[in-house]
Amino acid sequence: MVMTDPIADMLTRIRNANLARHETVEIPSSKMKKAIAMILLKEGFVKAVEEIDDGKGGILKITLKYGPNKERVISGLKRISKPGLRVYAKHDELPRVLGGLGIAIISTSKGIMTDKEARKAGLGGEVICYVW
């Protein structure tokens, strides 16, 4: 079966593993998925990101992060721009997620970055997802 939205699949796999309190989640790799995973790592939402070569496209192994009493660090993931309805925002219209507590991941002409980085660089782009 052909996957129509690989980014939504990635977010759903992370969301499901997080809700089931799994330690790791494995996702088929791509450049965009790796960039999103690296942002989640840099922003402190996940513990580690590892790329495994399986002879095909590769696999991203994401180690999820939990608090001392197994409380979830990621409380929500939401896909915004979908293949059927793309969502774009100018640099001055970039959304603030939960008043700055969460992040929006934006695909800009300079690569994939958070809403804060895009605002600072004065770049707009496609709003991929929200993480809080």
Swiss-Prot record:
Recorded GO CC terms: ribonucleoprotein complex; ribosome
Family annotation (InterPro entries): Ribosomal_uS8, Ribosomal_uS8_CS, Ribosomal_uS8_sf
Any GO BP: translation
UniProt KW Ribonucleoprotein keyword: yes
Gene Ontology MF: a single term: structural constituent of ribosome
Keyword annotations: Ribonucleoprotein, Ribosomal protein, RNA-binding, rRNA-binding
Family the UniProt entry places it in: Belongs to the universal ribosomal protein uS8 family.
Function comment: One of the primary rRNA binding proteins, it binds directly to 16S rRNA central domain where it helps coordinate assembly of the platform of the 30S subunit.
Complex formation: Part of the 30S ribosomal subunit. Contacts proteins S5 and S12.
Name assigned to this protein: Small ribosomal subunit protein uS8
High-level lineage: Bacteria, Bacillati, Bacillota, Clostridia, Thermoanaerobacterales
